[in-house]
Amino acid sequence: MIPLLVKFPTRQRPDRFRYALNLLVKNMALPGDVHFLFTLDRNDPTVAELMTIINQLCAGTRAGYTIVEGDSTGKINAVNRDLPEFDKPWQSVIVASDDMHATPAWDRWATSAMAEYYPDGDGYVWFGDGFQKDICTIPLMGRAEYDRLGYIYN
């Protein structure tokens, strides 16, 4: 069972992606508890570069990762895409983005928040990004909540 699945869609911003992913990887406290699910668009002209970045930064860690190439119809679709077909069991999922930068032990903080507030996985933790007050741009969701709603982001 994967304690924390990180859903990371990306498109056409390899430099920003590299920076954000490097912070996620470098600041993991529990790499064996983290699995990244990367969503890439097959028509993205930078897809090969993005794959190289992922393999360079993730291969040397204990974190697992899966790369899926496909077709997204927009940002919301890209965030939600690929998760229904992901075949490894997981407890919680958090959305990552190339404009959000991880702080030290971000993964421990996320798993601790879920354990404290929704130990049964039936809930959603609202993390503010410092910019939006009315939109949850960094959703963290338990599996039971995801199964009920059928999406992470809308």
What function would you assign to each model-found segment?
Residues 90-101:
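Short beta-strand-to-loop acidic/aromatic patch adjacent to the donor-nucleotide binding site
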Residues 32-45, 67-70:
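Short beta-strand/loop segment that forms part of the nucleotide-sugar
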Residues 80-92:
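Active-site nucleotide-sugar/metal-binding loop of Leloir-type enzymes
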Residues 70-78:
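A short, glycine-/small-residue-rich helix N-cap motif at loop->alpha-helix starts
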